C-alpha cells in the first residue's frame, strides 16, 4: 500500500488563488506590487497570511525582528522543526511572486498535509522573514542575518529608510515587534522555494532548479575625482574626465568576470555623476561594482584584480580613485543530503530538473549558517524579477510546490 502522500500533488488552484489574493495588497503601478517592509501594506499582508495559517491550524510566534513563525506540531515533542521560509515584502516596483511564492507554498504544503491526514514526526514551521529585500532598510536579508548572528539586533533597529525612519520604530508602529529572542529557534532543516530570477530554467525548458550553491559577492564603491569643465570648449588632451575613467573600469570589470567563468558575474547597477549636467565633464563619479561567484578563491581574486587595476586606469587619466568595500557575503554550499532529497522528489514526480547556482542572495544563505539548508527554484518568464512584469505560470508554481511538499515530508518523516 502506498504511503500517505505518495505521488500526491498540492492543490495548484488553491495556491494560485492565494498568490493572487496576496497580490491585491500593496498594488504597484504596472501590475506588480509595492509592499515594502514595515509599511502599512506589509502589515496588511502579514495579517492575511496569519489568518490563513490559523485557519490551517498553525500557531504563531513572532520574534524581535518581526519574523513570523507558524507551526504545525509534530508527533515527537523533542524533534526539531523543519522550516519552510521566504518573505512577503517586495521591491518598490516588485512582482507578485518573488519571496511570496515560497511563503505561500509552505502554507500550501501544510494545507495539503491536512487534506491528506498526514502526520509528521518533526514539526513544520512556515516562516516569513522580515526585510529580505532591503529596498527600504539596507542591508537585504536583515532579519535572517540577525537570526544567524551576522548582524546584531541593535544594528538592525538603527537602520534608516530614505525618510530617516528607523527599522525599530517602524517595526513597533505596524504592530509586529514580537517578544521571542532572535535566533532562539533551532532547526532540523530549512527549505526555501523561490522563482529563479534569471533566464536559465526557461531557456533550458526545465521545470525545477535544484539549487546547490548561492554565489558570494563583493560590492565595491568607487569614488572617482576629476575636474569639472565645459564639454564643448575643453580640448580632449586637457581633460581630467572621471566619466571616461568609470567607463574604462566598467570594461575592465566585464573582462575580469568573463575570465573567471564558469559562474562569475560582474557589473554596475548604480552610479552618480556630479554635477550631472549635459555640458559639464563630471568632477566626481560614484558607482558600485557588484561581483559574484560561487567559488571563494575566484571571488576574492576578482576583487583583488579590480582593486589593483582600477587605480592604474585612473592614474593614466589623471583621475583620483578611492575604493571601499560596502557589502560582502561568502559563497554558500547547500546541504548535500537535502539537495539530493529535492532532486529525488523531482525525479519521483516526473519533473524535469537541473542544478542551479543562485545568483541572488536569499534568506537561505544566512539560514545555512545555522541549519542544514537547501533551495528549490521554478522558472520565471524571460528571467525577469525585481520588475512589475515578473511572471510565472500556474503550472511552474505548482511543480515547485509539489517538490517542496515531498522533500519536506521526507525530511520531517511521515508517521503512519
UniProtKB/Swiss-Prot annotation:
Cofactor(s) for this UniProt protein: Mn(2+); Ni(2+); Co(2+); Fe(2+)
Binding positions for an N-carbamoyl-L-alpha-amino acid per the UniProt entry: 197, 230, 279, 292, 361
Residues binding a divalent metal cation 2: 98, 133, 386
Gene Ontology MF annotations: hydrolase activity, acting on carbon-nitrogen (but not peptide) bonds, in linear amidines; metal ion binding; N-carbamoyl-L-amino-acid hydrolase activity
Site (Necessary for dimerization): 239
Superkingdom in the source lineage: Bacteria
Documented applications: Could be used as a biocatalyst in the 'hydantoinase process', which allows the total conversion of D,L-5-monosubstituted hydantoins into optically pure D- or L-amino acids.
pH dependence: Optimum pH is 8.
Chain segments carrying region Involved in dimerization: 213-331
A Gene Ontology BP annotation from the UniProt entry: amino acid biosynthetic process
Pfam families on file: M20_dimer, Peptidase_M20
Keyword Methyltransferase: no
Cofactor, free-text remark: Requires divalent metal cations for activity. Ni(2+), Mn(2+), Co(2+) and Fe(2+) are the most efficient in vitro. Binds 2 divalent metal cations per subunit.
Reaction(s) catalysed (UniProt annotation): an N-carbamoyl-L-alpha-amino acid + H2O + 2 H(+) = an L-alpha-amino acid + NH4(+) + CO2; N-carbamoyl-L-methionine + H2O + 2 H(+) = L-methionine + NH4(+) + CO2; N-acetyl-L-methionine + H2O = L-methionine + acetate; N(alpha)-formyl-L-methionine + H2O = formate + L-methionine
InterPro entries: Amidase_Cbmase (IPR010158), Bact_exopeptidase_dim_dom (IPR036264), Peptidase_M20 (IPR002933), Peptidase_M20_dimer (IPR011650)
The enzyme's E.C. designation: 3.5.1.87
Activity regulation text: Strongly inhibited by Hg(2+), Cu(2+), Zn(2+), Pb(2+) and Fe(3+) ions, and slightly inhibited by Na(+) and K(+) ions. Beta-mercaptoethanol and 5,5'-dithiobis-(2-nitrobenzoic acid)(DTNB) cause 34% and 42% inhibition, respectively.
UniProt cross-references to CDD domains, sorted A to Z: M20_bAS
Binding annotation for a divalent metal cation 1: 87, 98, 194
Summary of temperature dependence: Optimum temperature is 60 degrees Celsius. Shows a low thermostability, retaining only 20% activity after incubation at 50 degrees Celsius for 30 minutes.
Purpose: Catalyzes the hydrolysis of both aliphatic and aromatic N-carbamoyl-L-alpha-amino acids to free L-alpha-amino acids. Is strictly L-specific since it is inactive toward N-carbamoyl-D-alpha-amino acids. Is also able to hydrolyze N-formyl-L-methionine and N-acetyl-L-methionine, but not ureidosuccinate or 3-ureidopropanoate.
Similarity comment: Belongs to the peptidase M20 family.
Subunit structure: Homodimer.
Protein name, per record: N-carbamoyl-L-amino-acid amidohydrolase
Native source organism of the sequence: Rhizobium meliloti
Amino acid at each position: 500500500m502506498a504511503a500517505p502522500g505518495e505521488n500526491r500533488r498540492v492543490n495548484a488552484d488553491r495556491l494560485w488563488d492565494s498568490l493572487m489574493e496576496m497580490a491585491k495588497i500593496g498594488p504597484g503601478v504596472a501590475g506588480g506590487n509595492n509592499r515594502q517592509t514595515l509599511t502599512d501594506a506589509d502589515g496588511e499582508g502579514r495579517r492575511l497570511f496569519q489568518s490563513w495559517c490559523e485557519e490551517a491550524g498553525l500557531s504563531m510566534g513572532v520574534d524581535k525582528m518581526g519574523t513570523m513563525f507558524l507551526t504545525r506540531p509534530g508527533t515527537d515533542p523533542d524533534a526539531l522543526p523543519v522550516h519552510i521560509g521566504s518573505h512577503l515584502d517586495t521591491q518598490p516596483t516588485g512582482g507578485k511572486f518573488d519571496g511570496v511564492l515560497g511563503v505561500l507554498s509552505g502554507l500550501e504544503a501544510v494545507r495539503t498535509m491536512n487534506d491528506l491526514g498526514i502526520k509528521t514526526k518533526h514539526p513544520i514551521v512556515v516562516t516569513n522573514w522580515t526585510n529580505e529585500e532591503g529596498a527600504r532598510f539596507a542591508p537585504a536579508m536583515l532579519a535572517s542575518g540577525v537570526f544567524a548572528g551576522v548582524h546584531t539586533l541593535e544594528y538592525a533597529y538603527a537602520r534608516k529608510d530614505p525618510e530617516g525612519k528607523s527599522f525599530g520604530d517602524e517595526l513597533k508602529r505596524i504592530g509586529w515587534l514580537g517578544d521571542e529572542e532572535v535566533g532562539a529557534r533551532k532547526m532540523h532543516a530549512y527549505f526555501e522555494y523561490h522563482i529563479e530570477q534569471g533566464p536559465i530554467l526557461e531557456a533550458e525548458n526545465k521545470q525545477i532548479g535544484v539549487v546547490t550553491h548561492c554565489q558570494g559577492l563583493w560590492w565595491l564603491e568607487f569614488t572617482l575625482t576629476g575636474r569639472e569643465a565645459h564639454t564643448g570648449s575643453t580640448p580632449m588632451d586637457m581633460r581630467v574626465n572621471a566619466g571616461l575613467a568609470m567607463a574604462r573600469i566598467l570594461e575592465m570589470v566585464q573582462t575580469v568576470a568573463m575570465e573567471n567563468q564558469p559562474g562569475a558575474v560582474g557589473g554596475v547597477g548604480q552610479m552618480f555623476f556630479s554635477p550631472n549636467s549635459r555640458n559639464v565633464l563630471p568632477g566626481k563619479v560614484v558607482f558600485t561594482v557588484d561581483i559574484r561567484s560561487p567559488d571563494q578563491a575566484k571571488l576574492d581574486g576578482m576583487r583583488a584584480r579590480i582593486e589593483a587595476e582600477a587605480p592604474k586606469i585612473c592614474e593614466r587619466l589623471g583621475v583620483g580613485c578611492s575604493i571601499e568595500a560596502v557589502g560582502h557575503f561568502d559563497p554558500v554550499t547547500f546541504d548535500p543530503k537535502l539537495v539530493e532529497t529535492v532532486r529525488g522528489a523531482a525525479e519521483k514526480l516526473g519533473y524535469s530538473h537541473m542544478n542551479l547556482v543562485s545568483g541572488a542572495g536569499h534568506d537561505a544563505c544566512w539560514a545555512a549558517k545555522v541549519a542544514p539548508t537547501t533551495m528549490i527554484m521554478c522558472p520565471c518568464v524571460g528571467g525577469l524579477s525585481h520588475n512589475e512584469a515578473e511572471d510565472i505560470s500556474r503550472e511552474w508554481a505548482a511543480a515547485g510546490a509539489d517538490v517542496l511538499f515531498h522533500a519536506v515530508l521526507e525530511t520531517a518523516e511521515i508517521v503512519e
